[in-house]
């Protein structure tokens, strides 16, 4: 069967436990305040009109607008309805230009599967099911492990698990980058407990220089300083993901993009 649409719309990862520390609450508050101040005097840019996909590019069989929200689906495979029909991750790409330093807030909800928002990303050769994107991803899912992490699609993989404050350093002799763990910005279990299943959640991404932060429902989920200069993207595209795998539905709305001046 087709995955039930929300409001009637048309590679292996690991995880690790995160333990809280006494300074976590103060660190989270200061980080959130800094992010707000950094973009306080910039102008907000509209990237979604709430009606149609004007300004966006992707596979129109997979992306549409339902009830004021961008809606993406992974349809079932007719030969095996438990499996999705798409064979690679694909994306809806915002065609409004390259974005470097910015703050992006949006709401999402997801039924089954995995999704995310790409930023500072680049478009690769399109696949059978639409655009293919590489770059930073603000990950989220219907499950309990990955919402809020920093993942680099078709790149360096997981750069920070939920709750981590990391510095990414260049690898030796061109090998995978070294990830220095500098403490915690949030408690893994507490962050997950604040995420509403199959309901609307607010996601915020802050990117300034080589420093990126994610927040879900006001709780900071990662803090990363990317010193791997050969691989760290400084600007790029914004895009929304449909993940290969089981049938799923994901929705996005209420985007607020503020670019730093």
Show which residues each predicted segment covers.
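Bacterial N-terminal signal peptides that target proteins for export
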Residues: 19-30
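Short alpha-helix boundary/capping segments
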Residues: 7-9, 31-32
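Carbohydrate-interacting regions of secretory-pathway proteins
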Residues: 42-261
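Hydrophobic h-region of N-terminal signal peptides that target proteins for export
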Residues: 32-42
């Amino acid at each position: 069967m087709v995955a039930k649409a929300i409001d009637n719309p048309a590679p292996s990862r690991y995880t690790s436990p995160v333990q809280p520390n006494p300074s976590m609450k103060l660190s989270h508050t200061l980080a959130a305040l800094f992010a707000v101040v950094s973009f306080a005097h910039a102008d907000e840019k509209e990237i979604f009109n709430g009606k149609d996909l004007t300004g966006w590019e992707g596979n129109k069989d997979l992306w549409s607008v339902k009830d004021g929200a961008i809606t993406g689906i992974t349809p079932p495979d007719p030969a095996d309805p438990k499996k999705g029909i798409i064979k690679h991750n694909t994306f809806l790409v915002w065609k409004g230009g390259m974005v470097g330093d910015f703050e992006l807030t949006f709401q999402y909800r997801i039924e089954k599967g995995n999704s995310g928002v790409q930023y500072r990303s680049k478009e690769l050769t399109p696949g059978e099911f639409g655009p293919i994107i590489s770059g930073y991803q603000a990950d989220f899912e219907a499950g309990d492990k990955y919402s809020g992490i920093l993942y680099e699609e078709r790149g360096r993989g997981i750069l920070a698990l939920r709750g981590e404050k990391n510095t990414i350093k260049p690898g030796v002799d061109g090998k995978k980058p070294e990830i220095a763990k500098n403490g915690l910005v949030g408690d893994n279990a507490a962050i997950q407990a604040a995420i509403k299943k199959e309901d609307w959640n607010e996601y915020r991404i802050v990117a300034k220089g080589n420093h990126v932060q994610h927040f879900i429902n006001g709780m900071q989920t990662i803090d990363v300083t990317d010193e791997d200069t050969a691989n760290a993207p400084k600007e790029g595209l914004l895009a929304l993901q449909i993940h290969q795998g089981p049938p799923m539905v994901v929705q996005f709305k209420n985007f607020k993009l503020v670019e730093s001046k």
